[in-house]
């Protein structure tokens, strides 16, 4: 079994915490909804993770670095019987998502606005059915590669919290980071790449809504890859 608290990097996996000044509507949404949806890690995680949502749920999924929230919003509406935990340390991304909720706190959504490794270390074993990591910061300079989120320590974290046959999904338009992730996951004993042909990773996931970042990448001639790994 992977250890509960693997090594944590001394440098954050994310860059700035804040970008442009928030609009008044976004500020109001953050002040109203984030306290209601934010997870409190000061107490141990419950063994039955759906108790965080106050109702029985079919499964719990995790999205790390949800950006503007396009995919996460689409998923919580498509699957009301599934619990979703969204992690986004960038203030502007969190503000976009909560503003899009239009004052409603979906019962199947919980949020966390800090380092995802803290949340991963807090979660109980085998509690998550799927982890999504889409378009993470590629940290293109070689001296910054140690800050890429996909690494041995974080794959150990994923392996601990994912149930057997759970999925880790990764999408990126940066070929170097795609290859990096393939090599890391194929070298890890707890993950298996499920692609049987190139068509399996060239096309978006079922129900994929697209994102603004993805659209920009494609306009600039970069072609995303959509990888899926299974916890064995």
From Swiss-Prot:
Gene that encodes it: trmB
Protein family (similarity comment): Belongs to the class I-like SAM-binding methyltransferase superfamily. TrmB family.
PANTHER family the record matches: 3-DEOXY-D-MANNO-OCTULOSONIC-ACID TRANSFERASE/TRNA GUANINE-N 7 - -METHYLTRANSFERASE, PENTACOTRIPEPTIDE-REPEAT REGION OF PRORP DOMAIN-CONTAINING PROTEIN
Keywords: Methyltransferase, S-adenosyl-L-methionine, Transferase, tRNA processing
Native organism: Chelativorans sp. (strain BNC1)
Catalytic residues of the enzyme: 137
Catalytic reactions of this protein: guanosine(46) in tRNA + S-adenosyl-L-methionine = N(7)-methylguanosine(46) in tRNA + S-adenosyl-L-homocysteine
Residue stretches spanning the membrane: none
Pathway: tRNA modification; N(7)-methylguanine-tRNA biosynthesis
Amino-acid positions noted as binding S-adenosyl-L-methionine in the UniProt annotation, renumbered to this chain: 63, 88, 115, 137
Name this polypeptide is given: tRNA (guanine-N(7)-)-methyltransferase
Binding positions for substrate per the UniProt entry: 141, 173, 211-214
One Pfam assignment: Methyltransf_4
